[in-house]
């Protein structure tokens, strides 16, 4: 993407404020016009004084311009700041909404810290571009567009010097940008590495403390920062050279204007005021060209950040759901997988030709070794990912034909990690159903066996749970998560290792709450603790993404298959029980 396209797309975000931006454009035209007029007026005053002419009309005109200049400047300063700040806040909100609504598979592939870093840096970069566009870029472009024709109308010879100076600035900038393009892209990659390392370390700070990794991780960060500087310094060196060359060209141009102007005045071909005006033009041109150089540098440095953000936005729009998808309503909970397959790119993990059906209100236990595809299966049900083959039906409706939002409205999930927000207990429970009353929220807490410990807290339901619920115990966090699911009152329930991280006593309390939650709901239970799946109507044993055994708990436990082997390994079933079961069946 060229610099012009990067900049043009950045400015398109201001399209929502066309009227206000138009006012800023008009004000900048006024500022640029007055900027060009001032050197001419100053030259006329010099001529009037030296020729003993009338000065007052020129001074009055200058004073009038000063009034308009002040008004236009205040308008630009006020509106530019308000527009830039307002658009940044709006963009952050809009982009956040689009990004967070993306399928979890998209987030897993891209990485949370990467998307966050890209969004935040782009918002700040765009804010700077918008502010500079309205404060300086626009007036600079207009001033340059007016300056050259005005100067040429006064004297072509001195105008040629200004033209050569402008071309020199352009050539220097062009060369430097071509030499630093790859270097600046490398700098942005190093910034991402530094940010990801900091984010990763802070989010796992307890592990770093436990394994005495603080100093090692700090050294690693310093190493990443050193590499960043190694990539940054050559870019800075090139721009320093450009500044020196521009300054040299400006000085030479100013000297040439003075020399040629003096010769023309002595020859009687120009007035002193004209030379003064051209000196003002030269100073103005140098100042504006410096602004243009800074402007080009700003866009050049922003290029990699914005290209990544544009790619992020485009990928979000590509993954947005078709506008024609309808809503699924009045779900009873009958679910069918028809020859469903899904894969993770180059990974061998996934699902292969999975088929089964569940009646509304039944409980399905999904078991199998690590990496068998258990979580992938329930993720497909919730459209975290979309199946690459086959169909998933809810009450006979293909879930790819309905919106994710309407589908998930009918599914409540309790994860192994409760996933609490750094808000109050009440706020976390109310995530289950927006607009739930205080009474409904408290009833859900009671049903989840959470009310007792909540009432012992000083602030009760207003107690803040801390980051990811770190002010609560594991059992307390899980009971709040269960209360959230109860409040949602969805016909389909997913329990993803909901009790695996709890001790036996806490698990017993949480299991009672889960049993209450499961009533009259189609339930999927993922569990490594096989004792939790005894009451399942159906057990699916997955291995390598395939359903290798399927049936009731009793059927599979007496089949002497993979599931029975797991039961024996966990001590739930003995070899003697299996032998007796087979003897009974044979008889």
Curated annotation (Swiss-Prot):
Assembly: Homodimer.
Catalytic activity: [(1->2)-beta-D-glucosyl](n)(in) + ATP + H2O = [(1->2)-beta-D-glucosyl](n)(out) + ADP + phosphate + H(+)
Main location: membrane
EC number(s) on file: 7.5.2.3
Record keywords, A-Z: ATP-binding, Cell inner membrane, Cell membrane, Membrane, Nucleotide-binding, Sugar transport, Translocase, Transmembrane, Transmembrane helix, Transport
Function: Involved in beta-(1-->2)glucan export. Transmembrane domains (TMD) form a pore in the inner membrane and the ATP-binding domain (NBD) is responsible for energy generation.
Coiled-coil region(s): none
Lineage summary: Bacteria, Pseudomonadati, Pseudomonadota, Alphaproteobacteria, Hyphomicrobiales
GO cellular component: plasma membrane
Organism: Rhizobium johnstonii (strain DSM 114642 / LMG 32736 / 3841) (Rhizobium leguminosarum bv. viciae)
Free-text comment about domains: In NdvA the ATP-binding domain (NBD) and the transmembrane domain (TMD) are fused.
InterPro entries: AAA+_ATPase, ABC1_TM_dom, ABC1_TM_sf, ABC_transporter-like_ATP-bd, ABC_transporter-like_CS, NdvA, P-loop_NTPase, Type_1_exporter
GO MF annotation list: ABC-type beta-glucan transporter activity; ABC-type oligopeptide transporter activity; ATP binding; ATP hydrolysis activity
Short name of any one Pfam family annotated for the protein: ABC_tran
UniProt-listed Gene3D superfamilies: ABC transporter type 1, transmembrane domain, P-loop containing nucleotide triphosphate hydrolases
Entry membrane topology: Multi-pass membrane protein
The protein's name in its UniProt record: Beta-(1-->2)glucan export ATP-binding/permease protein NdvA
Transmembrane regions listed in the UniProt entry: 23-43, 57-77, 128-148, 158-178, 248-268, 272-292
SMART domains: AAA
Chain positions recorded as ATP binding sites: 368-375
Domain called ABC transporter: residue spans: 335-569
């Amino acid at each position: 993407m060229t610099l012009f396209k990067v900049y043009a797309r950045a400015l398109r975000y201001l399209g929502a404020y066309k009227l206000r931006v138009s006012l800023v454009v008009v004000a900048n035209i006024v500022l640029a016009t007055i900027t060009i007029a001032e050197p001419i007026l100053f030259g006329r005053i010099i001529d009037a004084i030296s020729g003993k002419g009338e000065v007052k009309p020129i001074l009055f005109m200058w004073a009038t311009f000063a009034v308009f200049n002040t008004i236009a400047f205040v308008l630009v300063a006020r509106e530019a700041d308000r527009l830039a700040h307002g658009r940044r806040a709006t963009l952050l909100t809009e982009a956040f909404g689009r990004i967070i609504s993306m399928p979890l598979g998209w987030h897993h592939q891209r990485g949370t810290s990467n998307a966050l870093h890209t969004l935040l840096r782009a918002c700040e970069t765009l804010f700077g571009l918008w502010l500079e566009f309205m404060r300086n870029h626009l007036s600079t472009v207009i001033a340059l567009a007016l300056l050259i024709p005005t100067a040429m109308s006064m004297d072509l010879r001195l105008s040629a010097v200004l033209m050569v100076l402008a071309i020199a600035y352009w050539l220097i900038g062009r060369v430097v940008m071509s030499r630093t393009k790859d270097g600046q892209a490398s700098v942005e990659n190093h910034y991402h590495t530094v940010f990801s390392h900091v984010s990763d370390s802070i989010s796992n700070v307890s592990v770093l403390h436990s394994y005495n990794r603080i100093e090692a991780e700090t050294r690693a960060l310093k190493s990443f920062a050193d590499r960043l500087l190694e990539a940054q310094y050559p870019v800075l060196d090139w721009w320093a050279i450009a500044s020196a060359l521009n300054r040299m060209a400006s000085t030479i141009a100013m000297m040439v204007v003075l020399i040629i102007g003096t010769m023309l005045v002595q020859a009687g071909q120009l007035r002193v005021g004209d030379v003064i005006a051209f000196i003002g033009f030269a100073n103005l041109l140098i100042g504006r060209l410096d602004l243009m150089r800074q402007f080009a540098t700003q866009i050049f440095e922003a290029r990699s950040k914005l290209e990544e953000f544009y790619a992020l936005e485009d990928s979000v729009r590509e993954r947005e759901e078709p506008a024609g998808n309808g809503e699924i309503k009045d779900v009873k909970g009958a679910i069918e997988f028809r020859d469903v397959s899904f894969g993770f790119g180059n990974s061998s993990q996934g699902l292969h030709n999975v088929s089964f059906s569940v009646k509304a209100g039944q409980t399905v236990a999904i078991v199998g070794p690590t990496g068998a595809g258990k979580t992938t299966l329930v993720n497909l049900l919730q459209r975290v990912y979309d199946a690459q083959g086959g169909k998933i039906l809810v009450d006979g409706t293909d879930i790819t034909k309905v919106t994710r939002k309407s589908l998930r409205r009918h599914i409540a999930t309790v994860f192994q990690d409760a996933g609490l927000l750094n808000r109050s207990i009440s706020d976390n429970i109310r995530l289950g159903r927006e607009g739930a009353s205080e009474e409904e929220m408290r009833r859900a807490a009671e049903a989840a066996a959470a009310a007792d410990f909540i009432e012992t807290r000083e602030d009760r339901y207003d107690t803040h749970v801390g980051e990811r619920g770190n002010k609560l115990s594991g059992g307390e966090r899980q009971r709040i998560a269960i209360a959230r699911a109860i409040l949602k009152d969805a016909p389909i329930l997913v329990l993803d290792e909901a009790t695996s991280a709890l001790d036996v006593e806490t698990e017993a309390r949480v299991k009672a709450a889960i049993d209450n939650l499961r009533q009259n709901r189609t339930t999927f239970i993922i569990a490594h603790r096989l004792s939790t799946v005894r009451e399942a109507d159906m057990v699916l044993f997955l291995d390598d993404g395939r359903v290798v055994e399927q049936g009731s708990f009793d059927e599979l436990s007496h089949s002497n298959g993979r599931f029975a082997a797991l039961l024996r390994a966990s001590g739930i079933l003995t070899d003697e029980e299996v032998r007796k079961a087979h003897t009974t069946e044979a008889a």
